[in-house]
Amino acid sequence: MIMFRSLSVTPVWKAGLSLSHRSIPINSRLSSVRNYISIGCANKTGSRLLRSAGVSSQYKDFRRFNSSSNGNGTDKNASVAPKTEVKKIVPPKPSTNGKSKTPTISELRIMKDLFKYIWPSGDNKVKIRVLIALALLIGAKLLNVQVPFFFKQTIDSMNIEWGPDVATVLPVAITMTILSYGAARFGAVMFGELRNAVFAKVAQNAIRKVSLQTFQHLMKLDLGWHLSRQTGGLTRAMDRGTKGISYVLSAMVFHMIPITFEISVVCGILTYQFGSSFAAMTFVTMLLYSFFTFKTTAWRTEFRRSANRADNKAASVALDSLINFEAVKYFNNEEYLANKYHQSLSKYRDSQIKVAQSLAFLNAGQNFIFTSALTAMMYMGASGVMEGALTVGDLVLINQLVFQLSVPLNFLGSVYRELKQSLIDMESLFKLQKNPILIKNTERPLMLPEHLPCEIKFENVTFGYQPDRNILKNATFTIAPGKKTAIVGPSGSGKSTILRLVFRFYDPQQGRILLDGKDIRELDLDELRRIVGVVPQDTPLFNDTIWENVKFGRINATDNEIVTAIEKAQLSDLIHKLPKGTETIVGERGLMISGGEKQRLAIARVLLKDTPIMFFDEATSALDTHTEQSLLKTIKENFSDVAKTSVYIAHRLRTIADADKIIVLENGAVREEGTHNALLANPNSLYSELWNIQENLDMLEDELEDELKLEKEPRTSKKD
């Protein structure tokens, strides 16, 4: 039998509704009281809520009653707590530059990381494709270099005196030369296109593997890492990084290697055909052109990095604003967020303007170098023709060979610029893969205990999300197998942290968590998480159908098992009312359904998962009383099996009064533990204090509801 400890304070409650607070609407006072009940602890926040309800005198009298040494409602012997100095909160200083302090990855390291995807160990099919693509590349460039030679031969062949005795039909030799010219040009293009087709599969496979491995790595990172990152920035970094891989691969195979090969061939031909002076001029031009391009591009790189940072920030602001659309509307902060988004876009605009201006400078410098060299070589060639050392065809050949380099050289500038940009984008992607996995299996993980459910034991566990602020402090307690255990306490005492530690979202800094005597850090991580089910306070749902969200509890479940879980969670009524039934989209984070329906969906998920250990993390605290009672009934019907260990983290003590064991936390340590009756039997226990506060607030809630009804009655009679 549950014992309800009553207090002789009813007159105080009635007297507390003083005339000075009658001006406060009853609905407002009732809402404040209900909010305080949901807090479930006697703290300063609750005191403010009560004052807003106009019942601060009751709260003070009740506190005096509970804190008195003799328990008779007086506070003569009550000790007065010393006043503590209130520290002022200092607003954060605005960022002055916004530059990232994170270390960069060298370009050589990035290329090395990428190379293993295009030349994978043990995958001969991919290697053969790469070799075929390189062979086609070389063939295309050799044919491309032959084009100016056929053009030269055609011009020299036609350098004859045409008269009436000369046949009107071109000689066969000239015809063959022209046809060879066309065939070489067509062959070079076809070889290039075949190279693209052969290498496309290699490039796309590399992109797929990098994206998949990055995603899998992100899924293995700890919860703390994800909570400290902005989702919008992460998705943008992955998107740009994969595009960067695509460009780097195409640039290397389709541009950088071909350009280098073609320049080498042209320099060799010029040296062999016309002497070292033409080759030296070409070589010096290439050096100057490349040096200017690389130096200028390196200078422009920081502008691009700055643009990326601003782009990430803008994406994060936009995504956060859209995800929290309701909150934006509640507080009328559309203009504030628009200004915030505008600031990020302005920084992106400024960086992009610098990128465009520096690009104009780069293009002008490149054209000046190349045009100067081409003019000088044309002068040298024309001089050779006038001296008789060269033919007109030779002059055309020199012009064609050098001018033919202008196309790849122009590509060299743009390719190098984009290559640097792509490497920056890939740097962000590969950085994600370099983040260390803190929560992982040991080299030889142990098997789970044979008998489930098993005992969960915390041994001197100390843990904090921040190094200088511990949430749990040397906590020691035991959760018995097959029993209902409740964990209660004031906000911030570490209740939800216990769930996160058992699930191994984090590892404790000190102490151990044991399952039947085995440290959970030594158990297989996937197996551990497979036997723990969670119904959280705010159920995370995907923007998908009800059916798919329930199925997420166990992907390989049969249709009958999913239907059974839906029926047990009492979702059938909702589904029958919806036009599309189980195919109804729940919306982003489940915003298209009510809080109670979201929790029932969460219950259906864990029913489908069917785990021997269950955690209910304040699963009903955000719901109204009627919905809460209905859900508690559903939970009791489905999770009362002795083969399951149920752990309830709760603020509302009425919901866990029937627990086999109640653990009371305060300031990160176990204050007391026992059954509901045993804890209430001790008038000085924290649990007794919390219980009495909530019980008397329930009384006040009932009185305010009655007063609200009386207030409505005269209005009804007047209408009649």
Swiss-Prot record:
One of its GO terms (cellular component) is mitochondrial inner membrane. Residues 456-692 form the ABC transporter domain. It comes from the Eukaryota. It is a multi-pass membrane protein. Residues 64-77 have a biased composition (Polar residues). This is Iron-sulfur clusters transporter ATM1, mitochondrial. PROSITE patterns: ABC_TM1F, ABC_TRANSPORTER_1, ABC_TRANSPORTER_2. The gene is ATM1. GO terms for biological process: intracellular iron ion homeostasis. Belongs to the ABC transporter superfamily. ABCB family. Heavy Metal importer (TC 3.A.1.210) subfamily. Residues 130-421 form the ABC transmembrane type-1 domain. It comes from Kluyveromyces lactis (strain ATCC 8585 / CBS 2359 / DSM 70799 / NBRC 1267 / NRRL Y-1140 / WM37) (Yeast). Keywords: ATP-binding, Membrane, Mitochondrion, Mitochondrion inner membrane, Nucleotide-binding, Transit peptide, Translocase, Transmembrane, Transmembrane helix, Transport. Glutathione binds at R300, T301, E302, F303, R304, N363, A364, G365, Q366, G413.
